Amino acid sequence: MPRRGPVPKRDVLPDPIYNSKLVTRLINKIMIDGKKGKAQKILYTAFDIIRERTGKDPMEVFEQALKNVMPVLEVRARRVGGANYQVPVEVRPDRRVTLGLRWLVQYARLRGERTMEERLANEIMDAANNTGAAVKKREDTHKMAEANKAFAHYRW
């Protein structure tokens, strides 16, 4: 850890079309090898697909999807007397958003549709409807935390 104190969080600029920092963060998660233009094109096309299929504002659908994917609890490994325990802890608000975005992109990449735009659009729409792999990941994370509730007193 640095001795100079905590490293400040760097703030991202809001994206040009939706004027949202969340959208910029999602673009950065989609981006591979620094190709931001391509990542933007993927996201904006996915948003167009969402608008076309649902008839709703894609930002509303995306925000609902993110809300449904963000975890409240997670488990962290804690070593006590030679044994590793999975200790349930609450997730910090900034980490909730990060994990939600990460899982949306991760499970969109694993889908079977032809293009990344379609995969991302479908994953976001599924998450907004409380279905899909990203929501399942959140449920599994919560189940793990629930199952290890007995070790909650090891929290730090």
UniProtKB/Swiss-Prot annotation:
Keywords: Ribonucleoprotein, Ribosomal protein, RNA-binding, rRNA-binding, tRNA-binding. It comes from the Bacteria. GO terms for biological process: translation. The keyword Ribonucleoprotein applies. InterPro entries: Ribosomal_uS7 (IPR000235), Ribosomal_uS7_bac/org-type (IPR005717), Ribosomal_uS7_CS (IPR020606), Ribosomal_uS7_dom (IPR023798), Ribosomal_uS7_dom_sf (IPR036823). One of its GO terms (cellular component) is small ribosomal subunit. The keyword Phosphoprotein does not apply. Pfam families: Ribosomal_S7. GO terms for molecular function: rRNA binding; structural constituent of ribosome; tRNA binding. One of the primary rRNA binding proteins, it binds directly to 16S rRNA where it nucleates assembly of the head domain of the 30S subunit. Is located at the subunit interface close to the decoding center, probably blocks exit of the E-site tRNA. Belongs to the universal ribosomal protein uS7 family. PANTHER family: RIBOSOMAL PROTEIN S7 (PTHR11205). Part of the 30S ribosomal subunit. Contacts proteins S9 and S11. This is Small ribosomal subunit protein uS7.
